[in-house]
């Protein structure tokens, strides 16, 4: 420890020593018979104590939280027998041998320097009294001298009394603080030292060994410290620690061990490793119970739901069958197909009434059985779905006007959504991705988009949806005849990405239900949501796997085709007005593809505008679509119109599909030049986009003028056997007025209100809880590694009394930061794609972030316990468990926020690298003395380390005061800043969470 650092630390301790007039005066009062002078002397002593306490608090408050308490712990002797003995032996002259304020200042200034600098005027070159020897003192000659001057001391010199220490060159004595052991020394003839101290007396003099000669920090000298394994109730008594107790260095009393057998005689520490093991076992059992019971709770809840669902389905089926029978009987009676006599009619009437009564009785009993709200909701859902199936018309015969009529009752929930695009062009640099795309996507129809690979099918969908950041876009996109941004309508637009972006650690039903809850209309009842959910599950054929986990790459779940249908169902349950699908049938077999298309056609019957990119559909599947968009390379339209007219159109150009050829595949082969064919006139397959433009009267771009010149008799080509522009849309032109009336009616597409932030937060909270409970293995590994790290660091990096554990706590902060930060990456890194999809659909980022952070608070609260259960009991520091817990709680909270930020900013590999590197760098920066304080203040390890040091320093009192002040001064710490350090670390955690939230909002 540097001399300058020791100096300031020792000044604080030395000023305490000036207050030590109290013990001897108190003992002296016992010798005075007259109480009057004793009272006046006590008052003067109290005044001096208060004055010194105020001075110490002002100058050295950084190492003393409470001066009065520190005074009491250091110098309030409950047993002052050594003072009484001293007074008796000196016949009341002990007070004159005590050091004054000026002499104490000399002692303080000499700390950290050579002993030769510690001399008073009584021990200079001209005068060296006998009391100048270490461990010796002399009486004051002039009692009237000022406290600011060193009094003359040259008489009655003698060895220092037990319980006091006499510095070399001062000729006075100072009481030893509590926790010190200052007996009279004995001369060691072999070494010439005065045992148990480290000083020598002048050879050949008539002096003898006195008591201690110094009190300083433990690094400079530990001669006066009560040795470990012993306790010193007074500064002149030393006792062995008895069995069942332990005594640390500088102890004034024995500390009882919780288990007597863990502490043998002269034990210095309690064997707390056993308690750490017990706490680990308890923590493990609790965590296992929580995760296992919670997992069982999820399974039990799923079984209850399944039972209620089956029961409700049975009741709904029975009700539907009964209604069908009564309806048939009624029709037979009304049509007079059943002849009966009047008596028969009366009997039938009576029988009907009886059956009705019985039916009512049965319904009454059923209502009692359906008292549970869950079963009642499922019953209503299945009843509604059953009625829809009965009333559902044949999809192949429905017209657009029929679609409009069927969708009229749902328009309040699903407004009609028509998309018209005119001259849509998309480019990046000089490359054209889409060129002059004109047409429309109509509500109530299912449109297929096809074309060669690289023709721009997905790009076309993104351009229509407005997801064209970084591209140059020209042309118009009209929504119900009005110009506007598609992003404004994202709450009623469903987009199914090409990749199956679903949550693998949720079941099929949980994925769909979450989407239905968060994206449906705000006022939609739970019963209606269940109806929608059951309808989608039924239409997509997901009944058998509804309770199966979707699965991930690491953990197998449902099949790829089933996963694809779940991907589509996530958008269907929110009841969109516009449903866009990017290759929904990829990876599906023919049966699954047809099942999916039937579900999409059912959506179209509700007035939904459905558009899908398709690859190589079968002929049956192709004919299930209403409209067909064929894109050529370069993003040009080769055909856009009804499926029923596509072969007629291409036949008019001389392109006829051979038998047993699939029309869409044949047309794509023509566009790619794989199949050669001879077209009418001088046209070639590369001219198909140009011919489509000419046929519809679209403006031909300049770069296509040359191709236009290559075609002879273009106009004749279209006047002979070709369709008119109006005819190309078949049914659409037939009902144009009806569609226009329903699509253009004054209904705001922005009226749908989805659940607010708080409601979504609740749904997210439930989802994240289920995900965490299904990650029990990962959580267990995290806690196991923390416990192992605590054992290693607690065993190897011991907290030393001289440094208060600065080095070991640095390693501890690195380990906890690294492990908890890496674990926090899992909160956001694995779900980046899912989050993007949910955010683009209009779901709340704030609710998503807060829910994940809220669930992570469980780990924030428990992980410090897991780590301390091993570290604290294997390291056994002096600080209290609760103080350590508060520090590590703040630390885990802070680094978790940093982990969030890295998980959002970087890919998983880079985020892991940063999480491993940053804690090490920040600990090094925060502990280097040559780094500016401003820079160190920005490092959370600096504040965490200071809090840990302060937590330990508070437990060092009495003889440890100088050591405490020196250690705190060296690190620049303040013992009063424990709460401040905790608050700063927590605020850093809040700051990084705020940065992470902003990053989520801006993430592309």
Swiss-Prot record:
Kindly list the GO molecular function terms attached to this UniProt entry. ABC-type transporter activity; ATP binding; ATP hydrolysis activity; ATPase-coupled transmembrane transporter activity
Cell location: Membrane
Q: Where is the composition biased (Basic and acidic residues)?
A: 352-361
Q: Identify the keywords attached in UniProt to this record, alphabetized.
A: ATP-binding, Membrane, Nucleotide-binding, Signal, Transmembrane, Transmembrane helix, Transport
The residues forming the signal peptide are 1-27
Residue spans crossing the bilayer: 271-291, 776-796, 804-824, 886-906, 907-927, 943-963, 978-998
Q: Where is this region: Disordered?
A: 343-373
Matches recorded under SMART domains: AAA
SUPFAM superfamilies under this entry? P-loop containing nucleoside triphosphate hydrolases (SSF52540)
Q: Quote the record's binding site residues for ATP.
A: 451-458
Basic residues compositional bias, start-end:
362-372
Q: Name one GO cellular component term.
A: membrane
Per the database record, which ranges form the ABC transporter domain? 419-659
Its induction note reads: Up-regulated in shoots by cold, heat, salicylic acid and 1-aminocyclopropane-1-carboxylic acid (ACC). Down-regulated in shoots by mannitol, abscisic acid, kinetin, benzylaminopurine, indole-3-acetic acid and gibberellic acid. Up-regulated in roots by clod, salt, jasmonic acid, salicylic acid, ACC and benzylaminopurine. Down-regulated in roots by indole-3-acetic acid and gibberellic acid.
Q: Its membrane topology, per UniProt?
A: Multi-pass membrane protein
Q: Which GO terms describe its biological process?
A: transmembrane transport
For this protein, the record's InterPro entries field holds: AAA+_ATPase, ABC_transporter-like_ATP-bd, ABC_transporter-like_CS, ABCG_dom, ABCG_transporters, P-loop_NTPase
What family is reported?
Answer: Belongs to the ABC transporter superfamily. ABCG family. Eye pigment precursor importer (TC 3.A.1.204) subfamily.
Q: What is this protein called?
A: ABC transporter G family member 25
Write down the species.
Oryza sativa subsp. japonica (Rice)
